[in-house]
Amino acid sequence: MPDSADAPEEVPEFVDIVLEDDRWEDADLPAMAERAARAVGEWLGLDAFQVVVMGCDDARIAALNAEFRGKPKPTNVLSWPAVEFEAREPGAHPEPPGAEELGDIAISYDTCLREAEAQGKPFADHATHLLVHAMLHLAGYDHIDDEDAETMEDAERSILGKLGIPDPYLEHET
C-alpha cells in the first residue's frame, strides 16, 4: 500500500463547462478555460474557486444579452458574479473574493471567431483573453470609468503575459 505522502497531489478543477455549441469542443474550451482560471487565481492569490463557463453561439448569447442587459444582439462574452462587490475608489483593485463560487460566464464562438479574424489574432489567444476578462469581472473588476478600465486592462496584460499571450490592446494588422 503506497504511503499517502507518495500519492500525487490532487489538483482542483476551477471550471465547470457547459457546451451548447460543438465547435467549442473542437477548440478545446475546457482546457482554455481551466488555463485561464488557474492564471487568474494565481494572480488574485486564490488557491481554489469555481466558475461555470458556457460555450455557445451568437443566437444563444444574443438571447442572454437581451434578457440580462436589455441588448438583443450578440456579444463576445457575458458574466454573472456570484456575489455583489462593495463600491471602491476608481482605479483601485477590488478585494479578492471570499466566495468559492465566483459566478458564471457565457462566451460566443461566432463573435469570438469574427473578432479574432478581424484583429489578426489566433482564436485561442482571443478566447483566452475574453475568459480572463470575464473572470476578472467575476472577481469585482470593471471598466465603466477610465481609471477602472486601466486597472482591469493592466491586470489582463499581466495575466495573459504569464500565459505567453501578447497584449490584446495593441493595434493589430488585419
Curated annotation (Swiss-Prot):
Zn(2+) binds at residues 133, 137, 143. GO terms for biological process: rRNA processing. Its cofactor is Zn(2+). SUPFAM superfamilies: Metalloproteases ('zincins'), catalytic domain. NCBIfam families: rRNA maturation RNase YbeY (TIGR00043). Gene3D superfamilies: Metalloproteases ('zincins'), catalytic domain. The keyword Nuclease applies. InterPro entries: MetalPrtase_cat_dom_sf_prd, YbeY, YbeY_CS. Binds 1 zinc ion. This is Endoribonuclease YbeY. Single strand-specific metallo-endoribonuclease involved in late-stage 70S ribosome quality control and in maturation of the 3' terminus of the 16S rRNA. One of its GO terms (cellular component) is cytoplasm. It is found in: Cytoplasm. GO terms for molecular function: metalloendopeptidase activity; RNA endonuclease activity; zinc ion binding. Disulfide bonds: none annotated. Keywords: Cytoplasm, Endonuclease, Hydrolase, Metal-binding, Nuclease, Ribosome biogenesis, rRNA processing, Zinc. Its EC number is 3.1.-.-. Belongs to the endoribonuclease YbeY family.
